[in-house]
Each structure stands twice: as C-alpha cells, then as structure tokens.
Amino acid sequence: MTDRASPFHETEGDYRTEKFIEEGSAASPLYRLQKSLPRLPVPSLEETFARYLLSAQPLATAAEYQQTVGAAREFLRFGGLGEKLQARLVRRSKDREDSSWLAEWWNKTAYLHDRGPTVFFVSYYYHFSDSPGVAEDRTQTGRAAAILHAVLEFRRHVIGGTLPAQRMGKKKTPLCSTAYKYMFNACRVPGETEDRVRLYPPAGNHHVLVLRRNRFFVVHVTDAEGVPFSRRDIQSQLQAVIDLAGPRETETRPVGVLTAWGRPEWARARDQLLADGNTELLERAEAAALAVCLDDSAPLTKSEVARALWHGDGRNRHFDKSVQIVVFSNGKAGLLGEHSMMDGTPTIRLTDFVMKKTMGPSHDADGFPMAEASSPVLSVTSPRPLDFALSPRSLRAIVTAEAAFDQLVNEHEMEVFEFHGFGADEIKTFNISPDAFVQMALQLGVFKMTGEFWATHEPAQVHKFLHGRTACVRALSIAAKDWVLAMEMESDRRPTARRLELLRKAVECHVEYSRSAAEAKDADRHLLGLSKVLKSGEGESSPVFSDPIYSRSKHWRMSTSHLTHDMLESWGFGEVVPDG
C-alpha cells in the first residue's frame, strides 16, 4: 500500500500483516526463535468457569450468585452451547497456527476499536531517574542527546535483527519478538470506527520528529545507514531546533493536540489537514523513527513529573507515535508509549538499555562517553520545520480539541505515593509474594475508603507464546474478601494469628491465579473468545454473557500492574472505566 511517494504497511490488529519482516530476518537473533514458540492454548471450559465463578462471587449477592451459577451450568451442560463455542474456538486456533486465536481480537477490542482518546486511557509513561553525570548531561539538550543516541543504537539492533530474543526466568524461556516491529517508524492512524497502525520502512526514514513549542521538526541525527551521530552532534541538532522554535510568544497553533482528541474527531480533523495540503508533512511526522518532545516546563516533584509525562499540556506531543521521549527544561526525562500493538515488555527493555548507556561513569573531559557507536558527520541537513497550512476549519478543530483536552485533565488526579516502611525483601521473609501482598493491601485500602469491593485487574505477560500479549489476573477473590472483612470489621475479635492465616490464604489464591494466567489460562481472555464466536445474528445467545455479574466482574474499577526497575522513579497509566 502506498501514500504518495513513501510506501508503508498497514495493519488493523493482525500481527501476520507484517510477518514478512520476521521472515526476511528469520535467521537473525531477534526472530529466529519465532517458529519454535508454543501457540497460545485454549483453556478448558471447566477450568475457566471454575476461576470465573470464584472471582465473581465476591461481587454478587447470594441470589445473584445462584443465578450466575445456574447460567454457567446451562452453558456447560453436555451437548450445550458451551461445547459448540469451544469447538469453534479450537478450530480458530488450528486455523491460525502462524499466530494466535486471540491476538487480532485483542488488538482490536482493547485498542484499535476504542474510540476514546489514547492519552489517559491507552498511553503509559516511564519517569527516568535523573542523570548522575556531569553538568552537560543534565541540561535539556545534553540529556535529550544522550537518551536519543542510546535509543538510536537500540533501534539499529532492532531493525537489523541483531538484538537477541528476550528471555525470561531461570530457564531462559524465549519470548515473542513480534512487538518489536512496532517500536520504531510506526504510527497509529485514526479512523471513524476503528484505527490502523502504519509501519514505514526504516531505510529512508532515519529522521526523528522533534516537538518544540508546539511545532514539529524533522531532524536528521543518523547517517544514511541509521548509525547515530555523536552525542555532541545530536545535541547541536537539538539546539538548532530550540533556536528555530524561537521564544514562547512565537508558539504556533498546536496541531499535536489533535492527536489527544477522541479517535473519530481526530480522524475527521486529520482528513481536513490532508485537504488543507499537508499530506507530505503528516507523512514525514508519522514515518519518523520516534518522537522527541522538548518541553518548556520544569517539573520537580515525582508527582509533577508524572503528570507532565502522562499528559502534559497536550500540545507539544504526537500521541500516536509508538515511542515519545520527553525531556524537560531542567533535564528530567521519560518515555510515553502508545499501547495498541506493543506492551511494556519491549519498551522496558529499551528503557533498560537507555538507562545503562546514559547512566554509565565513563565520560571524556567534555562530558561525553569515551566509547560510542557513532557516525562521523561530514555534512548534516539542518532541522526542517513542518509548518502546517491550517484552514479555518482546522483552526476551529484545534481550539475545540484544546478545550476537550483541558477538561479531561481537570477530571483527573494523580499522586505518586512512596511507601518507605518496608519493602519486598522484608515481605519475602514471611514467605509471602510481594506482588500478592500489595494486591491485598490495595483491596483493604479500597474497602477502607469506600466500603465496597472492586473488580481488580492485574496483567500477566504471556509473551512466551507466539503473538502472546497479556492475560488477566483477577485480584479480588473470596479469600481476599474474607481477609479484608477480618481486618476491617472484626479486627477487635479476631486474633492476629487468624488474620495472618486468612492473609496467607488470600495470597495463595492470588499466586495460584497468577501462575495460571502466566500459562494463558485466565478466565477473561477465554470468555472473550467464546463471546466472539457466538453467532448472535443467527439467534445464538447465552445468559452467561448477559448476566449483570459477568459485566460487573470485568468492570475494572481498579486496574493495576507490577513493574520494577532500579532506574525508574515512577510509571503509570490511566483508568480503564469511567468510575475507575
């Protein structure tokens, strides 16, 4: 498929669309294990419904739960609808041996069909630790140059296939590498009813998109083969952007804020930008290797930095780019990721690479690393501003998008909370999983604040399967509810030993569910698959899927995730339901 002179490949959620990239590098370290990866299993109906019922019970009255159990029994009866749907799902799995029965459905349902803004509801951020290096590293352009140089080194390994496939655990289990295709030179494109993701060829698109004072700039920071310039030369290019952008009073209308709008609204605004004669400019922005945002603001506290990374003022961003590096005027920095085709596993690996490259102690007298893979610069193309032609209709769209974004910001609160009383090591001395312990603490906290129990989601990564992404761990259980009630309602009457016993049962339940989810045997993804093969247009229906407890049990008022990295100050994402 082509758009003017530059070719691109486009997907609507099926990882197989770009399979040619893997096949062209099948012998490379990054992709050579792909064909040997196990396929995502289809769990049995019995184990899925056992997990589902146990997790639904804490959210239901006794009468509601009996109705839910009755619907499940009817679904599971011999020769019933459940068997038919399971057979269809197994057949789909066999038909997609080169992928996964779930991947395309999940990419569409969870991401590309979602019509809300990506910022807040899809995007996630990482707050990098401050640079401990020399003063030059801590300036805005110095920090940005150091990070960008490391990112471009990582990109060379990705597009060349020389990056080894990621492995996990003591057994060094290989993980699927498919998502790496969507890290660089990729951009989500809005549509009225569903989005698409475009991949541009790295060759010929080694430029980066730099945003400064709401303006877009195409900046060349590598040679023709993608080898990055030195940090010093990259810094010079970034300083040239700052000089071109001018003082704050010269800011232009922020085209970038359109990418923060709802997807149908942004799709219509994008069509208008194309009609205004901006096709080539949009293409250069979307085809860029990544985006780098040089912000005027200087957030100090972790909460201030978190908000600035998570959404900022919405103007100096391109929220559809897979990777955006954000650097503030005081040198604080982080990453903003677009989630539709790529989970956090690849980007945390990128972050680890960048942090180790930029936090190292080996600098020369000028403050630059003594060893770096860089291309000598004989001549360099100056940064090119992308100055959009804006019709009155486009100008009105920008004003409306700004107002919508500002209202959305005002509806959100964020606070980075740090607990210093004890940590994971002390929790482990009690033979308790730190992750499960924190999940139970969250359950107790919600009940203390609201007097309610909330459906709680925690992802488990299943990248060890071909085209696997995540499974769902349901953190609320009967065991968790029993412990919370013992702590809150009966703490004066229950001895400590009994409450500790209940905590251990709750933790064991969570750990067991987590282990099953890590094997792609969670209830939610399987139930989604069964609902997808239901032929509702032919009169098929099941009370399982219309049961209010089913809806309530997957209405994630609390959405959580577990990630640890020594060089991240914080990280996060937004709520997944309006009252979450």
Give names to the regions the model predicted.
Residues Q324:
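Conserved ATP phosphate-binding architecture of protein kinases
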Residues M1-K321, S329-G331, E338, M342-G580:
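Long, Pro/Ser/Thr-rich low-complexity/intrinsically disordered regulatory tracts in eukaryotic proteins
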